[in-house]
Amino acid sequence: MLGSATIMSGGQAVSSLQNRVIFMVALICAGEAVYALPFHVTRFFRPTVLEVFGITATELGAAQGIYGIVAMIAYFPGGPLADRFPARKLLAFSLWSTAVGGLYMATFPGYVGSILVWGFFGVTTILLFWAALIRATRDWGGVYTQGRAYGVLDGGRGLMQAVMATIGAILLSLMLPDGVTPTIEDKEQALRLVIYFYTGMT
């Protein structure tokens, strides 16, 4: 009887560990994927973005500035929102909403549309997401290992960023013709595929 109880206890411990690992991996993937559309696309593919969107670097900076303003405001109600609603529901809604923004982004909306979509990303990635991510990570870490939890989260996000950027660069290069100067249509198709990739990851 004692042996059976020990085996059952050990099995429960393994199952609990597996669940914790899966949950943290999900947090890492979500925690980086949600910021891919507002940040990765312009960070790693800026020249193509400017040409395809038909905007200048200054106009792109203005759109990202709108993101910053909306995000700064969104931090304040984001905390109480995370305390009121389950973190998993907020994270899921944020990811889906950001993906919808990605579909609009893939239409290359120009300057005004860029202002709107980056402002929208400020709501979906901060108001709905950031505080919920922090809360879920804190709960995962418990009372004594919160620092370790945040370290694993940020380290994993860095790795996730590198993997996604590499795949995005490969997709872009595969879509552009070899040996000839790519046309604007070629660049549009290539960048759209990259945006769809990031949208799918979100």
Which residues does each predicted region cover?
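Hydrophobic core of transmembrane alpha-helices in multi-pass small-molecule transporters
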Residues: 113-128
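Glycine-rich segments within core transmembrane alpha-helices of 12-TM secondary carriers
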Residues: 150-173
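Symmetry-related core transmembrane helices of the 12-TM Major Facilitator Superfamily/SLC fold
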Residues: 192-202
